[in-house]
């Protein structure tokens, strides 16, 4: 008899991703595991509202001859896999059968395994490979001669139709702006003597698309007498490639990042990234993939979400809470990849310290989810997923705020009214009157 009760009251644990195991890429073994897990999901259906994967699975079952998983053609399993964008919410917030439960369900990592097999078989579209290469694309698109053309073409309806055909970017999807003066060019070194030392992993998005938000983070940290450095010569965190199933690239990027990050960790620096997905990658995912690497564990322990670090300053009486009033009403969308870090509601807590700021919270997925929200095959679904958040915007809402700027931009874009979106750290900077 199982020692675990229905619903699993034990604290969830997670097993390492055994991607080097010979059975990991065995398609028959994969299909057997998919059938087992799909049957468990079929009997539960608690996750039906999270994303498109689960409705796709349940529709396949309900429309089969047997009304069971055994009636679903295994060739159709791919339809379920393709709708998963590895948000991790099912594992962290819904599933009652995650380890240590006997049934050992890890739906996201099972989907990752399926994606990895698809990638190994050469079934991944070239356009998807391009879209999951933000560092390479950003390095080209942000060149001084090229960035004005790229930004102009992204606002041209006719050219967006061409981009949809060639690159698979949906013509109505919000796409980022590229800056020729990226983060590494606008960051200014400043010497501060402090026991609190932070090194910022700028991220691909911060370097090429949104350097302002990262500089806002730098300004807030320095205002609180924190020594801040920008980490030079880093690779992409690997999250986009992981969502593609390209584990070889994930490991390659990680190995290239380990040395510069470990140098800083050994020098006593904490690490921060402005994008929740990048933080999640270093905190949670890479330790599961490179579980034998002790340096990855040390890097994971040193990595902080920006507001998690500000909370650390509060605990150490090293945080300035003398904010000016901001008379605005905001919709704060809690980013999925921040939620699943299980670090607590630090952003909400600190925004609550700002006088007169009215914070309305939407703890639901934005639907953006990396490339899912921009691809022509899935953009329509992303709008549907994010619409419950967008509907929370009222005539009184002044701003959409999200720790994931891309998620916030997506919500603002699909809303029925024009509204701006910013990172919450920019609100904190405003409240400091910097």
Describe every region a protein language model picked out.
Residues 18-42, 72-73:
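Asp/Glu-centered strand-loop micro-motifs enriched in Gly/Pro and often flanked by an aromatic residue
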Residues 2-8, 28-40, 47, 172-187:
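Short N-terminal secondary-structure initiator segments
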Residues 1-2, 154:
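Polybasic, low-complexity association/targeting segments
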Residues 2, 6-24, 49-85, 97-128, ...:
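Non-heme iron-sulfur electron-transfer modules
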Residues 33-54, 76-102, 114, 137-141, ...:
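Cysteine-centered iron-sulfur cluster-binding motifs in ferredoxin-type domains/subunits
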Residues 105-434:
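Iron-sulfur cluster-binding electron-transfer modules in prokaryotic oxidoreductases
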Residues 15-18, 27, 60-61, 71, ...:
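A short alpha-helix capping/helix-coil boundary motif
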Residues 29-33, 76, 252-253, 385:
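Short, glycine/acidic-rich beta->alpha junctions
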């Amino acid at each position: 008899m199982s020692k675990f009760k229905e619903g699993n009251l034990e604290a969830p644990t997670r097993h390492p991703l055994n991607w080097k195991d010979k059975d990991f890429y065995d398609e028959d073994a994969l299909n057997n595991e998919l059938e087992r897990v799909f049957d468990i999901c079929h009997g539960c259906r608690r996750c039906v509202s999270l994303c498109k994967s689960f409705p796709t699975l349940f529709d396949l079952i309900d429309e089969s001859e047997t009304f069971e998983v055994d009636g679903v053609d295994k060739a159709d399993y791919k339809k379920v896999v393709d709708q998963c964008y590895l948000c991790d919410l099912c594992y962290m917030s819904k599933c009652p059968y995650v380890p240590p439960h006997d049934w050992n369900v890890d739906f996201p990592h099972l989907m990752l395994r399926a994606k990895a097999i698809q990638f190994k078989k050469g079934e991944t579209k070239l356009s998807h490979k391009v879209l999951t290469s933000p560092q390479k694309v950003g390095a080209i698109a942000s060149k001084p001669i090229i960035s004005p053309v790229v930004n102009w073409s992204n606002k041209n309806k006719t050219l967006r139709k061409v981009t949809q055909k060639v690159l698979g970017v949906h013509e109505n999807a919000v796409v980022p702006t590229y800056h020729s003066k990226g983060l590494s060019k606008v960051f200014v070194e400043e010497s501060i003597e402090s026991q609190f030392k932070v090194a910022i992993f700028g991220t691909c998005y911060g370097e090429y698309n949104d350097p302002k938000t990262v500089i806002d983070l730098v300004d807030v940290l320095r205002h609180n007498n924190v020594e801040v450095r920008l980490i030079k010569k880093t690779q992409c965190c690997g999250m986009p490639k992981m969502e593609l199933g390209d584990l070889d690239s994930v490991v390659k990027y990680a190995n290239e990042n380990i040395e510069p990050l470990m140098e800083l960790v050994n020098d006593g620096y904490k690490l921060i990234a402005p994008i929740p997905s990048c933080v999640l990658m270093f905190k949670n995912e890479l330790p599961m993939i490179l579980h034998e690497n002790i340096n990855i564990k040390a890097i994971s322990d040193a990595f902080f979400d920006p507001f998690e670090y500000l909370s650390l300053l509060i605990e150490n009486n090293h945080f300035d809470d003398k904010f000016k009033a901001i008379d605005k009403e905001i919709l704060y969308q809690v980013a999925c990849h921040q939620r699943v870090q299980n670090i607590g509601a630090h952003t909400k807590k600190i925004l609550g310290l700002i006088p007169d700021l009215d914070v309305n919270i939407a703890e639901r997925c934005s639907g953006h989810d990396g490339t899912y929200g921009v691809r022509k095959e899935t953009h329509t679904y992303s709008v549907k997923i994010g619409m419950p958040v967008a509907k929370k915007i009222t005539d009184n809402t002044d701003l959409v705020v999200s720790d994931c700027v891309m998620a916030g931009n997506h919500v603002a874009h699909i809303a029925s009214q024009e509204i701006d979106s910013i990172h919450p750290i920019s609100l904190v900077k405003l409240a400091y009157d910097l």
